[in-house]
From Swiss-Prot:
SUPFAM superfamilies: GHMP Kinase, C-terminal domain, Ribosomal protein S5 domain 2-like. The active site is at K13, D138. GO terms for molecular function: 4-(cytidine 5'-diphospho)-2-C-methyl-D-erythritol kinase activity; ATP binding. Belongs to the GHMP kinase family. IspE subfamily. It catalyses: 4-CDP-2-C-methyl-D-erythritol + ATP = 4-CDP-2-C-methyl-D-erythritol 2-phosphate + ADP + H(+). The keyword Magnesium does not apply. One of its GO terms (biological process) is isopentenyl diphosphate biosynthetic process, methylerythritol 4-phosphate pathway. It comes from Pseudomonas syringae pv. syringae (strain B728a). Catalyzes the phosphorylation of the position 2 hydroxy group of 4-diphosphocytidyl-2C-methyl-D-erythritol. ATP binds at P96, M97, G98, G99, G100, I101, G102, G103, G104, S105, S106. Transmembrane segments: none annotated. Keywords: ATP-binding, Isoprene biosynthesis, Kinase, Nucleotide-binding, Transferase. This is 4-diphosphocytidyl-2-C-methyl-D-erythritol kinase. The lineage of its organism: Bacteria, Pseudomonadati, Pseudomonadota, Gammaproteobacteria, Pseudomonadales. Its EC number is 2.7.1.148.
Amino acid sequence: MSTPQLVLPAPAKLNLMLHILGRRPDGYHELQTLFQFLDYGDELGFSVREDGEIHLQTDVPGVPHDSNLIVKAARALQQQSGCTLGMDIWLEKRLPMGGGIGGGSSDAATTLLALNHLWQLGWDEDRLAQLGLTLGADVPVFVRGHAAFAEGVGEILTPVDPEEPWYLVLVPQVSVSTAEIFSDPLLTRDTPPIKVRPVPKGNSRNDCKAVVERRYPEVRNALNLLGKFTEAKLTGTGSCVFGAFPNKAEADKVSALLTETLTGFVAKGSNISMLHRKLQIL
């Protein structure tokens, strides 16, 4: 591998709560959710090509090259901007697929921001976020890089600043299909809307949790194990579960006990994504 011109992180996110308010006529769901980033994620490398080709140099098992959101993001930006340059892209994958922590969406957002920089397009955040929304509902929050209360299908973002604890995230070895969860007839779809401020705490939950637990015993097991030490929550539509701790030492202590049988990691919550902190010093 040649040395990339630019290396950037693609951070994970957590849904600290996820309420489903109803189903729209177009089949999508109205929801309210609270996004916060983690100082942990994938890493991407980028080098400009002169021939206009987009090449992801890293194979992702189970995902064809042209179906990868990284490639889709690069080609969408290339097409919309009219840029004739190309890009070689490398991926160091740490975030699980179907984990509910934003792996694919975060990779796509990092790609948009990196290519905007390297191709010197000068697109602003609003324009990049609008393009990101065509790739996935979670892409805009990663483009903007600030913890947010999201409404609509997840695209209406209000910046917020919740507490930034340490988290233990457990990763059950299953990939959860978002479409499968949202189409489940037993999914709660009538939660009353809540206000953005104060930042939701006690009255918050994940409306997908009961459906995911019923369909995936591995997730139920992880929630039960973590729940012995702290409040255990599901992020997104799963499969990852998480719990908050006041400091790294306590999170590490529980991690040492649980990761003998489960995969997991400890990371700091952050209201400004590590991607944006890196971009600010370029």
